[in-house]
């Protein structure tokens, strides 16, 4: 399906302005990550999807669990992206409801800083589901942490 979609978009529709990311769920592990890989000629970027969780309202334990998983995933993804000459990204992440007041600066940033990630993408903010959001907005109680994250020298947004 991945190959058919890419071929349809590029050959049939003539689209040339799309980057194609292969990104199985983060729990695929190094032994299964490439099991459905469509081939180097169909992929531009290798990514992982891994979400944080707040376990029993224990920010420190939740942070440690997230770091362990993400470091393992980004380590094997670094090897794979080098072997296949691909960019790598953190294609989906976030903490639903942002219950950690410092999720951006003390959970996400420390775990990505040592890896050559081309981009990080959080999941959506649902307009119709209270509590189902992954990015702060102006007026949100922890918006200052996302703002501090955005001002780090290592972080660049699309409009910069």
Where do the protein language model's features map onto the residues?
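Structured segments of extracytoplasmic/periplasmic soluble domains
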Residues: 4-12, 76-83, 110-123
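Aromatic-lined carbohydrate-recognition surfaces of secreted/lumenal glycan-active proteins
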Residues: 2-32, 85-98, 122
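Aromatic- and acid-rich polysaccharide-binding/catalytic face
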Residues: 33-67, 123-125
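Substrate-binding cleft of secreted/luminal carbohydrate-active enzymes
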Residues: 86-160
